């Protein structure tokens, strides 16, 4: 240590954290003072392969017919999944996320900053999730946006009736003949690995897979003894798959029109996105939440304030719960 250094040598016995002596972080778990003979339990490489693939394909089989399909695992999609799956453990909730990492744009606040701002009353959802925040009067601040999205993601994935298929994208919607009212009827989603979808222009035909909504007989006709499943699209407004379902609905049904997202206005945008979230007129069994609603209905964007992202998911989830309760 140089003569000019201000560093102070401190023995381990002097270190304290909250008046509790610091000990080895694994001392109460592994309980090994001498690591020279440390060993993991043995395993074969094929055992790992079978453990992964058997469970994944079992999930594909189980969720091939789902009650709720959520497209997009950002803040609104995950918030909706939490509310639906927690309140209705009997429903199979399938979440499809195009990215390897779920969470959408909620890992950071605005302009890649850390803190997440939520206007009240969105703090009530934070309380439900037991996420700490600083109360600033009309709004609250979560110290890091990742704390919010990682918490809701963790809670959703622990629910037994939820499956997240990440690195998987929705390429199209499954449709049925229009209803008597002339409404387009969605009956499922067409999926593929995201990397395959992005490589369609480089290879010959690489056909997709399908996840169907509950409510149909083996011949494809409606089974009126079952509640029809629903799709909740929360694909945001930017990125390679932004507002995908909204754009696809407009392509399928010429009576529909894409409003196009307007400029930033926090006070109008957050309110409007929450209020407009939910069932979509003219499309049976289709719901929207999050920034995709702004693209669909021509609403303002709100920028780096996240209360509407969570509560639009909650609002859509409540409508979906009413659908299954009716």
UniProtKB/Swiss-Prot annotation:
Protein family membership? Belongs to the THI4 family.
- Record's note on what induces expression: Repressed by thiamine.
Q: GO biological process: any one?
A: thiamine biosynthetic process
State whether it acts alone or in a complex, and with which partners, per the record.
Answer: Homooctamer; tetramer of dimers.
The record describes the protein's role as:
Involved in biosynthesis of the thiamine precursor thiazole. Catalyzes the conversion of NAD and glycine to adenosine diphosphate 5-(2-hydroxyethyl)-4-methylthiazole-2-carboxylic acid (ADT), an adenylated thiazole intermediate. The reaction includes an iron-dependent sulfide transfer from a conserved cysteine residue of the protein to a thiazole intermediate. The enzyme can only undergo a single turnover, which suggests it is a suicide enzyme. May have additional roles in adaptation to various stress conditions and in DNA damage tolerance.
What keywords would UniProt list here? Cytoplasm, Iron, Metal-binding, NAD, Nucleus, Thiamine biosynthesis, Transferase
Which residue spans adopt a coiled-coil conformation according to this UniProt entry? none
Binding note for cofactor: Binds 1 Fe cation per subunit.
GO terms under cellular component = cytosol; nucleus
Q: Any extra detail in the entry?
A: Expressed at high levels in the early stationary phase of batch cultures growing on molasses, an industrial medium.
Q: What is the effect of changing residue 238 to A?
A: Partially active, with very weak activity toward NAD
Query: What happens upon changing residue 205 to S?
Result: Partially active, with very weak activity toward NAD
What this protein catalyses is: [ADP-thiazole synthase]-L-cysteine + glycine + NAD(+) = [ADP-thiazole synthase]-dehydroalanine + ADP-5-ethyl-4-methylthiazole-2-carboxylate + nicotinamide + 3 H2O + 2 H(+)
Cellular compartment(s) = Cytoplasm; Nucleus
Kindly report the protein's main subcellular placement as a broad class. cytoplasm
**A GO MF term:** cysteine-dependent adenosine diphosphate thiazole synthase activity
User: Could you state what the record's PTM comment says about this protein?
Assistant: During the catalytic reaction, a sulfide is transferred from Cys-205 to a reaction intermediate, generating a dehydroalanine residue.
Q: What is the effect of changing residue 204 to A?
A: Partially active, trapping the enzyme at an advanced intermediate, just before the sulfide transfer reaction
Q: What is this protein called?
A: Thiamine thiazole synthase
Q: Does the keyword rRNA-binding apply?
A: no
Sites of 2,3-didehydroalanine (Cys) modification: 205
